Structures are given as structure tokens and as C-alpha cells.
Regions:
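Membrane-embedded transmembrane alpha-helical bundles that form the catalytic cores
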Residues: 1-286
Length: 286
């Protein structure tokens, strides 16, 4: 890409790379979801039009293997391509360095999303772990493990799941407590994984940015997204929201850009209508 003299040539390489990355993500993670949506639409059209052939369309999911961490390393590869295109980092000299950046294991399961310009410079430095960093890394791993296994899993198995599975068996207050319990469960689960990833990386001589900053202390939705899953929200802002025009093209366009960003952010979390609605609600709130 950098060897191409033409500006349009470089853009073409970027577009091709994005199509490959997003195409693979779309196939592995969203193909069955799209087929299910299309089957439901066809069935409804058949019912409305009285077409029995459309009504008889059934959805059978394909057995597609979902690569571990595909949502995270796809965003990492996209950040590398765009940062090189924008001139924020120099292209890697060796392919093995790129493979190392994409496949570095601590964050692949649940983040944080590691950006090329933050991680790649660390590759060329000799990893040195001081006593303080070793203690900090070990503390983060243990805290993350405690959040995940002791708090999140316990709340899920012994409280939240029971209420969500049979809400009519419980009072309104108990259902409300179940909602708050789920909020605590999802925070401890997600931030626990992030803490462990950051701690393991630190023990190996690499530093990741903080991914959660007491999000439930936020006073507004905007502040919440500055504190919750920081690596994702900042990635969406820098590589999607700003690329769409951000707030530079008027109030209506700003609202549209926010809604698109949050819709895609919700879809990134999972292939289901509930995640799309969740993203839409946050987009409207922002």
C-alpha cells in the first residue's frame, strides 16, 4: 500500500483490505444470523401474499466454526491498515511482527482491543518487567479472576439466571434486583477478563490501556461510554464515527452518525436482534 504512488491506489488497497477483513468476520459471525433474518422475512411475505412456497421456507443454521477472538483481531487488523494509510505508524518491516501483533493471546478472548500504534512500538523494545510491574500484573490477574469466578459466575448461577428463566415466579422487587444483578454480573465478567488480559500482558513486558474505569459511577450516557469498554468505544469513535463525518456536518448528520456507530457497536457484541436494539437505544440516548 505504501509503495503505491497514487492516492486512489492506496485507497483501493485500504478498501480491499477492509472488504477481506469484514467479509471474513461477516461470514463466520453473522452469516447464519442473516440467513435467519431472510428466512423470517420470506415467511412473513409468504403469509401476507398467500404464497405457500415462501411460507414453507425454513431456517437451518450452517455448521460454521467461529474462530476464537475474531471480533477482536479483525478490529486490530483494521486499525493497522488505517493507521498505516493515515501515516500514523510506519508499515511493519517483517511479516512475523504483524502475525505477532494480531495473534498476541492475552486479549483475544474478551479484549481489550489493542491498537496498532499503541502495541507495535513495544515489539521493538526489549521486554523488561520491574518488580512494581510484576506486582501490578499479578494483582490485576488475581482481581480479574476474582471478578469473573467469584462474583460474576456466582451471581449468574445462583440469582440472575433463576429469575430470568422464570420471572413470573418472583415478585416485582426480585425481578428488579435481577436486572441490577445482571448489570453487576456483566460488568464483573467483562472487566474481569480485561483485567486478566492486561495483567498477563504486563507480566510479559507489554502494557495495554485500561478498558473499564468505574462505568457505573457515570452521571450521563456519554460519560458511561467514556468509561465502559474504553478500547471499543474509542475505536468506534476514531475509525467509524469520525470517518462518517463525526459532528462536522450539522446536527442531523451527527445524530445519524451516532446512531449508525452504536447500531454497529451493538451488532459487534453479538449476532442477534437484541444486541441491535441495545445499540439503537444507546445511540438514541447519546
Amino acid at each position: 500500500m505504501t509503495k503505491t504512488a497514487s492516492k486512489w491506489g492506496r485507497k483501493a488497497w485500504v478498501v480491499l483490505s477492509l472488504c477481506v477483513d469484514l467479509g471474513l468476520l461477516g461470514y463466520f459471525k453473522y452469516f447464519n444470523f442473516l440467513r435467519e433474518i431472510m428466512a423470517a422475512v420470506a415467511h412473513e411475505l409468504g403469509y401476507q401474499l398467500g404464497n405457500t412456497s415462501l411460507q414453507n421456507i425454513t431456517y437451518q443454521p450452517l455448521d460454521i466454526f467461529l474462530p476464537v477472538g475474531i471480533s477482536f483481531f479483525t478490529f486490530q487488523t483494521i486499525s493497522y491498515v488505517i493507521d498505516v494509510y493515515r501515516g500514523r505508524i510506519a508499515p511493519l518491516r517483517r511479516w512475523i511482527d504483524y502475525v505477532f501483533y494480531v495473534s498476541f493471546f492475552p486479549q483475544l478472548v474478551a479484549g481489550p482491543i489493542v491498537r496498532a500504534r499503541d502495541f507495535i512500538p513495544q515489539i521493538y523494545k526489549t521486554p523488561v518487567v520491574t518488580r512494581a510491574e510484576f506486582g501490578e500484573g499479578l494483582f490485576l490477574v488475581l482481581c480479574g479472576l476474582f471478578k469473573k469466578t467469584v462474583i460474576s459466575d456466582y451471581i449468574s448461577l445462583n440469582f440472575v439466571d433463576r429469575i430470568f428463566d422464570a420471572p413470573l415466579l418472583y415478585t416485582g422487587v426480585e425481578n428488579l434486583l435481577g436486572v441490577y444483578g445482571y448489570a453487576l454480573q456483566i460488568y464483573c465478567d467483562f472487566s474481569g477478563y480485561s483485567d486478566m488480559a492486561i495483567g498477563i500482558a504486563l507480566l510479559l513486558g507489554f502494557r495495554f490501556n485500561v478498558n473499564f474505569d468505574s462505568p457505573y459511577q457515570s452521571a450521563t450516557i456519554t460519560e458511561f461510554w467514556r468509561r465502559w469498554h474504553i478500547s471499543l468505544s474509542s475505536w468506534l469513535k476514531d475509525y467509524l464515527y469520525i470517518s462518517l463525518g463525526g459532528n462536522r456536518k450539522g446536527k442531523i448528520r451527527t445524530y445519524i452518525n451516532l446512531l449508525i456507530t452504536m447500531l454497529l457497536g451493538g451488532l459487534w457484541h453479538g449476532a442477534s436482534v437484541s444486541f441491535i436494539l441495545w445499540g439503537a437505544l444507546h445511540g438514541v440516548a447519546l
